[in-house]
Amino acid sequence: MEKYGFPKPNSLPTELQCEVLQWQNEEEMQRQRVLLASLNSTCPNNSEQQRAFESIMNSIHDFTNANREELTEHRFHFIGGPGGTGKSALFKKLHAACRSLGLLITICAATTLAALLFDGAVTAHSLFDYPVEDEEDVDDLNPTQCDIKKERAEFLHEVSVIFWDEFVSNDRNLMEAVLDLFETLWDEPRYFVFVCAGDFAQVSSHSLLCVMTIYMKNI
């Protein structure tokens, strides 16, 4: 930087500080309110989508207004349906609604292509520092764990809502590793609102059983 005439910074902001600066300011919150109004105008919810939107936002409101130290479980919401049923549109509205309220959220997806649909989204492997494995390297008896660094742990600790698109397309070992991570990463277990979207018709019956087992035991 000094080569181009810029002063050398005394320190670099942490990941949490970067996220707060980017999303938790009045200008950005107003932009998200405008975005939400635009989405509602161009792609209004049908009755089922509106019920889902209100139910999830009420759950998020109750969760974020509770004492986090007294919570004892995650809250899961799943938006399911085949392509063209409005999952992505509803997801975008929920993101905008949360950010317009100044909530700190994070968004991940099963693939890079899916992550590109949403502002600030990354792949689930990237968010949770979980390595991409070849199928022959997977060992169910000794599952791979998430390798979260200090800055990412600090950021996740302050997050209220985790949005996860194409949830069912991820390997079950990743999902189990994430849930185990939140039990052991900090001195006390930390709980979150998970809002997941996907199409169960896209996975085999065996994979569906694995996903549903993980999902049901953590409701």
Language model segments and positions:
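Conserved ATP-binding/catalytic motifs of P-loop helicase motor domains
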Residues: 1-219
